[in-house]
Amino acid sequence: MFAGIFLRMGAALRSMYVNSKYEEVREEWEEDYSPQRFSYKALYKATKGFKESELFGTEANGTVYKGKLSSNAQIAVKRVSLDAEQDTKHLVSQIVGIGKLRHKNLVQLLGYCRRKGELLLVYDYMPYGNLDDFLFNEERPNLSWSQRFHIIKGVASALLYLHEQIVLHRDVKAANVLLDEDLNGRLDYGLARFGTNRNPMLGSVGYVAPELIITGMPTTKADVYSFGALLLEFACGRMFIEYPGKPEEFNLISWVCQCWKRGNLVGARDARLEGDYVCKEIEMVLKLGLLCAQYNPEDRPSMSQVVNYLEGNDVLPEMPPDTPGISIPTPYHEVLA
């Protein structure tokens, strides 16, 4: 008799442990989002209990794990800490809305899961990780110019699609460009897009448009500025802002303009490309990067124009390197002082 009681008590305790282990936070208003909701148990099993061996990367606000669902679909799971001040309902509605967007060069957001103080975002798995690892990590294989040009055209197409859907990205940068199994560039939203970044200045230092520092209001032209910084990084293989550096190399805008004024614009290219590049394409990307990263937002092209330039459907306007607004680097040294 007592043995039976102890067995039942043991089973009940084990059940309580399992339930608490997989415990989630679900509220009534989330019923509308059930199709986009993953169970914590499914994500726990997919990542082998969020084992360190499945850790794929770390970000400022969270960690990323690779996983495999019971359907054999490969996924990436971002674990993000939440605080009590955040509007969870608004955050979840943003996630679901973004998940409905479809473009071949966007990282697909598949859904989410919520626990106490934690949000889990589920994405398509991108096996080659992010672009900045290839551009700025000398231990990684070098991307050829044809690969870079293919990637940047894909990212431009994805950003244009977002703008056509009246969606701002707000954090375009190399770390938010992921590479799939075929080395296609996929634009990721990062964490700033969902308001999990507590920094009031949306975006990342080095990619933030100068007017955004003052107004704090994101716009399509601010996205274009960030894309211009990315274009220069693609061609030069260097970070848009470097510390420390020679005065003319402090900002890629200054560096590229100096090379241009010396009559050697292509000399600003990534030395690792050696002779593996198309001169006209390099020149066009460098000039387009400067055009996008102009100080005055009204002078920057739209993403529709950018895509036309990259696809060869339109020709860049004539402009010398000392064109007003072109050679003005953003004064981040003053902002960060």
Curated annotation (Swiss-Prot):
Residues that hold ATP according to the record: 56-64, 78
Protein kinase domain segment(s): 50-316
Gene Ontology MF terms in the entry: ATP binding; protein serine kinase activity; protein serine/threonine kinase activity
Modified residues (Phosphotyrosine): 123
Active site: 171
Entry's Gene Ontology BP terms: response to other organism
Family to which the UniProt record says this protein belongs: Belongs to the protein kinase superfamily. Ser/Thr protein kinase family.
PANTHER family assigned: PTHR27007
Official protein name in the record: Receptor like protein kinase S.3
Source species of the chain: Arabidopsis thaliana (Mouse-ear cress)
The gene coding this protein: LECRKS3
